[in-house]
């Protein structure tokens, strides 16, 4: 239905885009509402005080919003009323807040259209590389590469301090000028009024109150900077491979030749300097990235300075150096994609025999290791209201109105997803504590619903009611290792298994990346 309604605004090849009229279409806001309901199992809709119905599901308010947007300067007046009512505590401020949220979510749906059109030509090739889309496919690559590297840059990707920079970057993806003007108007009014409340933190407030729109703007910015970054990285391969010359006098010494390359990128019209590093790997997920190198400490330090200057001179904002940490792999662990990863050094002795002589050779082997971050996971459970900050299980009041089967199914689904996602951990025993918290939280939620105690509930329903919370990993149904597999996975709490059917990070681990 939506595809038929979009045909009048878009060309098949995406060359002509008339996105601005979509802002006044009611079904756009319906799509935004449906996305909000299905985005996470932790979604908890707000209710309008005194009215008793879900604010995001009200088609009446959406129709009123569209009618007001047809009027001149209505968006400015709406946001002005919202911010003025915040100071005086007026009840109608919620309606203005609703207008701001719906405009933000509706425009985010529209902004996703140009990105989705770029994926249409390659839709036939996606099934062939389905396994490569899995998040877990990154870890075998890290196991193979990072164990031989010396240093890693742990990077928190900075974001522009001004929202106008994000709009300018979005122009590369959206050619509809009225839509960009509308976005500028919305962001300009939001920025001006929030500076009265929280100066210098406008973009932080915007990212929390308009998560979906901010994610679109942020992803376009990351895509742009990675395009330039990868372009420069590819250019470095055309440099000469000789990086040093040997001279023989009394002793051997080496004169290191630093290779620099002059690159002029048409989009920025600036000269960018790039250091040659043949052994470098870059991995990113959301706002965090790691840059690993086999080079020396001096080379990795130059990489840090280069990245700071790269963001400063090409995106016009200052990246704080403390957001980029230089760490040696030998004594450092980093959090990435819901795992705590490190390179373990295992000493071993090898017995060699030459003729009749025996001697021992001490060797060191490096192994890439991943474990479950228990304390951060408990913090995520605390944010989701499953336990206290200390890890004491509590009931989930908002789920107490559901049926018993739905409550057990929701808690059980969380446990199964956690076991499935953290199957690559070398120490799965630490997940038992997380399962215990969820099991007791489920029991307390059921006891709250039936107005009973946990002990009486388990005596009445039986202790086997919550058995699925301690299901072993080899019993979890998976398209890679089905339950009817012919070979048992003995010792699966020690074996690491990477599944190729996981295309998004677990919700609980997702809280950690954006916190």
Curated annotation (Swiss-Prot):
Family: Belongs to the intron maturase 2 family. MatK subfamily.
Predominant localisation class: plastid
Keyword list, A-Z: Chloroplast, mRNA processing, Plastid, RNA-binding, tRNA processing
Function per UniProt: Usually encoded in the trnK tRNA gene intron. Probably assists in splicing its own and other chloroplast group II introns.
Residues passing through the membrane, by range: none
This protein's name: Maturase K
Any one Gene Ontology cellular component term annotated for this protein: chloroplast
Native source organism of the sequence: Trillium pusillum
Superkingdom of origin: Eukaryota
GO biological process, alphabetically ordered: mRNA processing; RNA splicing; tRNA processing
InterPro entries: Domain_X (IPR024937), Maturase_MatK (IPR002866), Maturase_MatK_N (IPR024942)
């Amino acid at each position: 239905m939506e595809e038929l309604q979009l045909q009048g605004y878009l060309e098949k090849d995406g060359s002509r885009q008339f996105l601005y009229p979509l802002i006044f279409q009611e079904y756009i806001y319906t799509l935004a509402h449906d996305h909000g309901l299905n985005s996470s199992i932790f979604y908890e809709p707000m209710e309008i005080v005194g009215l008793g119905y879900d604010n995001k599901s009200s088609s009446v308010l959406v129709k009123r919003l569209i009618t007001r947007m047809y009027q001149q300067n209505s968006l400015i007046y709406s946001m002005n009323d919202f911010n003025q009512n915040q100071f005086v505590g007026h009840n109608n401020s919620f309606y203005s807040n609703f207008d701001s949220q719906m405009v933000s979510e509706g425009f985010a749906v529209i902004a996703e259209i140009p990105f989705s059109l770029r994926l249409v030509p390659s839709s036939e090739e996606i099934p062939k590389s389905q396994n490569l889309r899995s998040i877990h496919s990154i870890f075998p690559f890290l196991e193979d590469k990072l164990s031989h590297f010396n240093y890693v840059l742990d990077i928190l990707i900075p974001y522009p301090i001004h929202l106008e920079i994000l709009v300018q970057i979005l122009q590369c993806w959206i050619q509809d000028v009225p839509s960009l003007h509308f976005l500028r108007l919305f962001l300009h009014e939001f920025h001006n009024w929030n500076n009265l409340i929280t100066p210098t933190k406008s973009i932080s407030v915007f990212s929390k109150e308009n998560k979906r729109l901010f994610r679109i703007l942020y992803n376009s910015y990351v895509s742009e900077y990675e395009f330039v970054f990868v372009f420069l990285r590819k250019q470095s391969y055309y440099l000469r491979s000789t990086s040093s010359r040997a001279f023989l006098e009394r002793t051997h010494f080496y004169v290191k030749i630093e290779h620099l390359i002059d690159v002029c990128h048409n989009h920025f019209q600036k000269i960018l300097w790039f250091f040659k590093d043949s052994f470098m790997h870059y991995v990113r997920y959301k706002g965090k990235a790691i840059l690993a190198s086999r080079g020396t400490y001096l080379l990795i330090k130059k990489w840090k300075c280069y990245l700071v200057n790269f963001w400063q001179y090409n995106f016009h904002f200052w990246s704080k150096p403390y957001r980029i940490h230089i760490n040696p792999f030998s004594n450092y662990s980093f959090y990435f994609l819901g795992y705590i990863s490190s390179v373990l050094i295992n000493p071993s002795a090898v017995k060699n025999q030459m003729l009749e002589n025996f001697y021992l050779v001490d060797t060191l082997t490096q192994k890439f290791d991943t474990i479950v971050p228990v304390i951060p996971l408990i913090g995520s459970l605390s944010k989701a209201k499953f336990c206290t900050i200390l890890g004491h299980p509590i009931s989930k009041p908002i789920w107490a109105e559901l049926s018993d089967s739905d409550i057990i199914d929701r808690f059980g689904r969380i446990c199964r997803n956690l076991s499935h996602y953290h199957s690559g951990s070398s120490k799965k025993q630490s997940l038992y504590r997380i399962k215990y918290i969820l099991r007791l939280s489920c029991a307390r939620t059921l006891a709250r619903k039936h107005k009973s105690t946990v002990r009486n509930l388990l005596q009445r329903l039986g202790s086997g009611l919550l058995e699925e919370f301690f299901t072993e990993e080899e019993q979890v149904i998976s398209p890679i290792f089905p339950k009817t597999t012919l070979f048992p996975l003995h010792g699966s709490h020690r074996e690491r298994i990477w599944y190729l059917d996981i295309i998004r990070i677990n919700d609980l681990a997702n809280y950690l990346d954006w916190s």
